[in-house]
Regions:
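Alpha-helical scaffold domains
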Residues: 1-181
């Protein structure tokens, strides 16, 4: 797989991701070092990030959840693709209702991130989590909607019922208007 990543060709990196995923039942804890090296070394766009993280690293985390702490560390790195990786790694587990406290913690770490690719990544993670935990995700969004970037908010509520979407998207009246001024 390393040679495929080193080629710099996107199609070859996708083959590396697919091949690694086909072996996910054989992962051992020490494989995290290789996966993390790929994240830090080779991710340079959303496609390579999402292809590696959604299935391959997501499957690894499902087998070895002790590495959730590493994802929280990734969420604090200067590299935008590593920050996005911290969220999109949890898309499939989130859909399955797993790791909600960790998902919310990562979303909080990334909450004020100014990078739109990171906002879309953690918004997508929240949207996936809402499939199993709609009320919890709605409450999370509502508690943070005044500061949450609209891009992330829109992604997070995309699959919610219309009435919840409308509540989440409603802008708070300015204080002056509320005070009658």
């Amino acid at each position: 797989c390393e040679g495929l990543w080193q080629s710099g060709c996107m199609e070859e990196s996708f083959i590396a991701c697919q091949w690694a995923y086909t072996r996910h039942k054989e992962f051992v804890p020490d494989d995290f070092a290789t996966l993390e090296r790929w994240v830090h070394t080779y991710l340079s766009n959303w496609a390579s990030c999402d292809t590696l993280c959604n299935h391959t690293i997501g499957a690894f985390i499902q087998s070895y959840p002790e590495h959730l702490a590493d994802l929280k560390r990734w969420a604090r790195t200067p590299n935008r693709w590593v920050r996005r990786a911290s969220a999109v790694t949890l898309i499939i587990p989130a859909r399955q209702g797993q790791f909600l406290p960790d998902i919310l913690e990562i979303a909080d770490i990334l909450l004020m991130d100014e990078d739109d690719m990171v906002q879309k990544g953690y918004g997508w993670m929240l949207k996936a989590a809402s499939q199993a935990h709609q009320q919890e995700i709605f409450e999370f969004v509502m508690a943070r909607k005044a500061v949450m970037p609209r891009t992330a908010l829109r992604y997070a509520i995309e699959k919610m019922p219309k009435e919840l979407k409308e509540k989440a998207m409603a802008r708070e009246p300015e204080r002056r208007k509320r005070a009658g001024k």
